[in-house]
Amino acid sequence: MDKLSGENITKEYPGGITALRNVSIEVKRGDIVVVMGPSGSGKTTLINILGLLDVPTKGSVYLDGREINRLNERERCEIMNSSFGFIFQFFYLIPELTVIENIMLPLWIKERSYRKIKSYYEEAEKLLEEFHLLKRKDAYPSHLSGGEMQKVAICRSLICKPDIIFADEPTGSIDRESSEMFFNFVQLLNKKRGMTFFIGTHNEKFLQFATKVVYLNDGEIEKIKE
């Protein structure tokens, strides 16, 4: 991925609710884009639309010049599985799956081939080792701390080697120590792998290393700082 962009994005919901109004934004390879704004400003909606989890009412999303929001569901899923990673505030780990099974879940959806999935098992173990969780690979989410669950969510977002990671309030439900770990993770992957991040947050500490800051209010961009 060289560039992901949204042009004139508007999102309307039944009942006359407009979550986004004519929003245009550009994300380049290696960017750390931080979207700030109060609750209800449209941060999550923007993440969902750029990440193909939702579609705009009006406007377009482009990936390297290709309009992707009008593709069929299968084509959108292929892009999501190959190019996008997601980290959510509440992690959404499957309680019936072990740590390593949760990490492998995107591969099961993407590959649908046992042989291919098996070859990725070592990759999942390497990620767990990198985050000091290898000994917990067979544990279930109910036995993990908040910080450990966040690390599992991070590993899951990386297993398909995405071009960009979307993070929605990634430090919103974890303690200070785990938040510091996430800040370090973003900076390390950005520097080491050139990983691109698009982060919606209230946490102003992200501003210290953001390459672009977008301020949203009531579904509109108030200003952009680069």
Show the residue positions of the predicted features.
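A short, proline-enriched helix->beta-strand linker immediately N-terminal to the Walker B motif
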Residues: 159-163
